[in-house]
């Protein structure tokens, strides 16, 4: 990891790239190298809310729930959702307030974003679902 950061760290920072890893040792190494490089801890499932120094988390969408999101809101960390490859996953990610989505189907996500922006009823529906979901 040290060699990788020596070789690519400045470029990663210069171009605003981010790093993501399933290995928390990588998160620690990147933060020790330069705490301004965004680094996300990939979580394949949701069991216990992690307490880490990571910039945020990348959570598998089917295990993401309101408990995790509510805990996340008490931190300054961000949330990416993977793998958003269908409208159900997209709606869930939007409803839960994800900061970003990882997908194998970029055209589908772009289409869903366009539809949400262009259709006030769709946006209203998502907002209504979110309000019900969080019981406001």
Question: For each predicted feature, which ranges?
Answer:
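Metal-dependent phosphodiesterase/phospholipase catalytic core, i.e.
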Residues: 1-38, 59, 75, 130-136
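C-terminal active-site rim and adjoining tail of enzyme catalytic domains
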Residues: 33, 37-136
